[in-house]
Amino acid sequence: MTELGKYAGTVLAAYGASLVLLIGIVVQTVLANARARRELQEHERRG
């Protein structure tokens, strides 16, 4: 394995935190899109 050096833990934690935040943003976007689509369909159905 590659030697990551003295700050390996910090760097890996930063990458992990970034990945978690990115996944959270993607999930929130997908859920908001689904909610908006449902609301639009309901609005169009009512006229």
Curated annotation (Swiss-Prot):
Provide the function of this protein: Required for the export of heme to the periplasm for the biogenesis of c-type cytochromes.
- Region forming the signal peptide: none
Report any Pfam family annotated for this entry: CcmD
Q: What is this protein called?
A: Heme exporter protein D
| Presence of keyword Cell membrane | yes
> Lineage from the top down?
Bacteria, Pseudomonadati, Pseudomonadota, Alphaproteobacteria, Rhodobacterales
Q: Does the keyword rRNA-binding apply?
A: no
The UniProt entry's sequence similarity note says: Belongs to the CcmD/CycX/HelD family.
Q: Which residues cross the membrane?
A: 7-27
One GO biological process this protein is involved in is: cytochrome complex assembly
Quote the gene name from the UniProt entry.
Answer: ccmD
Write out the entry's keywords from A to Z. Cell inner membrane, Cell membrane, Cytochrome c-type biogenesis, Membrane, Transmembrane, Transmembrane helix, Transport
Provide the Gene Ontology terms for cellular component: plasma membrane
Q: Which subcellular locations apply to this protein? A: Cell inner membrane
